[in-house]
């Protein structure tokens, strides 16, 4: 395993561990659909089972969401070879693999995703989400930064991309 893959693997494992740990702790200590206010009128821990994706879209389409997750992981794996090898990109790919895998595990084993981060911003109750979702969003933002900086082009990468 080359150095690039080791760094991404470490970030992936740490992310996946934190995702599953936080979900398990919330499930163990907070009743389903109960809300524990942490910062008044701003942030609560609210444990819910999400049978869909973001904003509960595609609710009860678990098999489809599992397939989408697996396809996403394969595409992201292939993209690893298109982007320059640097700390930011390693972190981005590790976060993406960890976040997507964390929710994939829930979908495959439980049939739903455990969500618990509940923010109210300017009286808008934002959809409840989890650490895996945060990891995916941060990973995507980091890759967008890489694209704007021109770090998405590696010389002689066409053969790796094709196979």
Where are these regions (language model features)?
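Alpha-helical transmembrane bundles and membrane-interface segments of multipass inner-membrane proteins
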Residues: 1-163
């Amino acid at each position: 395993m080359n150095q690039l893959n080791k760094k991404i693997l470490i970030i992936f494992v740490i992310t996946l561990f934190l995702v599953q740990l936080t979900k398990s702790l919330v499930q163990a200590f907070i009743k389903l659909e109960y809300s524990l206010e942490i910062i008044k009128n701003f942030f609560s821990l609210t444990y819910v089972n999400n049978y869909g994706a973001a904003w509960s879209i595609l609710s009860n389409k678990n098999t489809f969401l599992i397939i989408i997750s697996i396809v996403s992981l394969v595409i992201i794996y292939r993209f690893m070879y298109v982007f320059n090898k640097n700390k930011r990109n390693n972190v981005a790919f590790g976060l993406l693999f960890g976040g997507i895998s964390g929710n994939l595990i829930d979908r495959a084993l439980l049939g739903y995703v455990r969500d618990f981060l509940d923010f109210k911003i300017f009286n808008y109750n934002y959809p409840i989400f989890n650490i895996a979702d945060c990891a995916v969003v941060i990973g995507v933002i980091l890759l967008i930064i890489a694209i704007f900086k021109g770090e998405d082009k590696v010389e002689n990468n066409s053969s790796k991309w094709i196979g």
